[in-house]
Amino acid sequence: RLGHGKPKCLVDFGGVSVLAHIMSLLKDVPDVRVVVGFMETAVIAELQRVRPDAIVVRNPSFRTTTTLHSYALGAQHLAGDCLFMDADLLIVPETFQAFLDGCRPGEARLALTASKTKDAVYAEMAGQAVTGFRREDPTAFEWSNISWLPVRYFEDIGMTAVYEHLRRYLPMASGEVVSFEIDTAEDLAQAKDNARLFGLTAT
């Protein structure tokens, strides 16, 4: 939908790719796995440049599967909990770290951000718990596509969106991050307007 003819993780912000930004946020995470599909050679080249020890997981069926399948592929052979996130996000580092600091073993947790994305998944809340998702009638917060989840959640999946799959596990705890998805041209423009927030440093 962005229409740049390349993966959104390779979009450049002042000499820093979105993928490089995400890898900088994960610098203290020892086991990082990146699921690749569209233009995988270019994505792998950038990944090797910025995080050479990351594990590459191929999704050759990316044209006929959903992000949910990529999550399941990335979670294979893991046990316990895992941080799942999309690779088209720009995130204020301090808020991301605060979310990580609040994650606990065995406790599913969703990262929410103030609603701003053109095609958002809005969170329905009861206190700090996410009780539902919807695409219409905006709420104050949208799901940021960042989650701390047990890998067993992805042992049995269908052909659906991630948020639809996660509905069966609600309610879930939540934490707030400041993040910008770059799914559309409007989203990209909004992220560029806020680029100063992300601590981007070219490498």
Please place each PLM-identified region on the residue numbering.
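N-terminal glycine-rich phosphate-binding loop and ensuing alpha1 helix
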Residues: 1-43
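Conserved beta-strand segments of alpha/beta enzyme cores
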Residues: 9, 31, 53-55, 171
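Short aromatic/basic micro-patch
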Residues: 12, 90, 148, 181-182
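Short, aromatic/basic amphipathic alpha-helical patches
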Residues: 44-50, 194
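Conserved beta-loop-beta/alpha segment of the NTase-like Rossmann-fold superfamily
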Residues: 51-125
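Conserved core of the sugar-phosphate nucleotidyltransferase
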Residues: 92-166, 171-175
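Terminal amphipathic alpha-helical/low-complexity segments used for targeting or macromolecular assembly
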Residues: 151-154, 163-203
